Amino acid sequence: QTNFSTLEAFFVGSAPLYDALRAFAAQRPLRMHMPGHKGKPLPAPELAAIAAIDFTELPPTGDLFSGGGAIGAAEALWAEVFHMDSCLFLTGGSTQGVHAALALACKPGETVLLDRGSHRSAYNALALLDLKPVYLERPWLASEGITGPISPSAVAQALEEYPDAKTLCITSPTYYGMLSDLPALAELMHRRGGVLVVDGAHAAHLPSLGNDHLSAA
């Protein structure tokens, strides 16, 4: 009998995808699919419950590419938490999200204002989409030993120098937790008919801390 108490501590209220995985695991199905551990307990006791509900895409568990079902319910719940109109879970990690966002925001050959501290996925997107970068350097904060935020004034200056740039792509928060003023940056870009693209791979916790106004969502 699998002990799910360690997992349930993470869930408060509705958890449609977790509930669907638990319900399917309770049927004790014959696992003729990935992953190779077949739901058997892993060496670390704290991972036993995770292995029990570790399924691939199946009719009872849902498919990230088609939506609906438990995955669709989970996406709707996530959108509600982040105050978004809708949500789509990525099928290939945050790198895929950066690629998709820039592909939607830009046309080949366009100029992009790019945070110099961006993840390599943004640089890969430049090559894949034939985009021209204008790099924004972050200020060095000597007392903290890290770089600071991308400031609205720096972006405004870059827009004056490169008026054809219609997309700003930054990371917020950074790996070190540095947040940029997203509302101000978004207003600045929207006022010029532009788009703000944010790599928020490290921002999922912000709404739970009451800082959802600093989240890209």
Describe the predicted segments one by one:
Residues 4-7, 11-22, 26, 66, ...:
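Conserved PLP-enzyme active-site core in the AAT-like
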